[in-house]
From Swiss-Prot:
It is an enzyme of class 3 (hydrolase). Binds 1 divalent metal cation per subunit. Its EC number is 3.1.3.5. A divalent metal cation binds at residues 10-11, 41, 96. Keywords: Cytoplasm, Hydrolase, Metal-binding, Nucleotide-binding. This is 5'-nucleotidase SurE. GO terms for molecular function: 3'-nucleotidase activity; 5'-nucleotidase activity; exopolyphosphatase activity; metal ion binding; nucleotide binding. It comes from Sorangium cellulosum (strain So ce56) (Polyangium cellulosum (strain So ce56)).
Length: 258
């Protein structure tokens, strides 16, 4: 039986990156797309709990949800056979138009879709490519990595489900590195403007980017022109701060903190 792969993204169900990955995956697996109806970049792992959602079958095996990437994976995995004929063997998110390096993973809808899959026990991989990358080459490499993850996860029966974040730099041929999260720092800005009626509005974010040196990191790999494959954890417990939590608990148990 061919593996069943659930494919999503945050750029929208008709995005070129998703189409390229879908076409490449379809050579090796059965693919069902469940992706946002419109661009949902930087929506992180939000779920739409306070409004109705719409599910549209845009084409056979291609579903659009008017919600976030995490909504899409949630709907696909919990809607019975409305979307998927059975439980998928793998969740693939991407190919994202743009990178998700370092702390980008906390904002990325692409990574969040994969994370939602892993939270539900399905091996998952997020794929992102630099705007200067050859999309056919990036899709081919991303699919090779996705299928390798499927084989490795199936053989080892890993629990919890593995979650990988892949970033592909500009170009069409790359070495591949196993990496850790790096440090990607942006020029933070709040830009205020006024509309034609005199009402104030603002834009947040900044265009300038620099990478701090973190040996063995995804940012280091990107700067060297290599593909980064970064395993992510669903357990956010910070052992290095366990002592602080213990101190606060002890002080509260002994009496109010002065």
């Amino acid at each position: 039986m061919r593996p069943l792969i659930l494919l999503s993204n945050d750029d929208g169900y008709s995005a070129p990156g998703l189409t390229a990955v879908r076409d490449e995956l379809a050579r090796h697996a059965d693919v069902v797309v469940c992706a946002p109806a419109v661009n949902q970049s930087a929506t992180s792992h939000s779920l739409s709990l306070h409004r109705v959602l719409r599910l549209l079958e845009a084409a056979p095996g291609v579903f659009a949800v008017d919600g976030t990437p995490a909504d899409c994976i949630y709907v696909a995995l919990h809607a019975g056979t409305r979307v998927l004929p059975r439980r998928p063997d793998l969740v693939v998110s991407g190919m994202n138009h743009g990178l998700n390096l370092g702390a980008d993973i906390f904002y990325s809808g692409t990574v969040a879709a994969a994370r939602e899959g892993a939270l539900r026990g399905v091996p998952s991989i997020a794929l992102s490519a630099d705007a200067g990358a050859s999309l056919p080459a990036a899709a081919a490499l991303g699919v090779k990595l996705a299928l390798a993850l499927h084989r490795a996860a199936g053989q080892e029966g890993r629990r919890p489900a593995p979650l990988l974040n892949v970033n592909i730099p500009a170009g069409s041929s790359w070495p591949v590195r196993a990496t850790r999260m790096g440090a990607r720092l942006y020029t933070e800005e709040v830009i205020f403007r006024r509309d034609p009626r005199g009402h104030e509005y603002l834009w947040i974010g900044g265009a300038g980017v620099r990478h701090d040196l973190v040996p063995g990191s995804d940012t280091e790999a990107y700067d060297a022109g290599a593909v980064s494959v970064t395993p992510l954890t669903l357990d956010l417990f910070a052992a290095q701060h366990e002592g602080i939590a213990g101190l606060l608990a002890a002080e509260l148990n002994d009496g109010p903190i002065p």
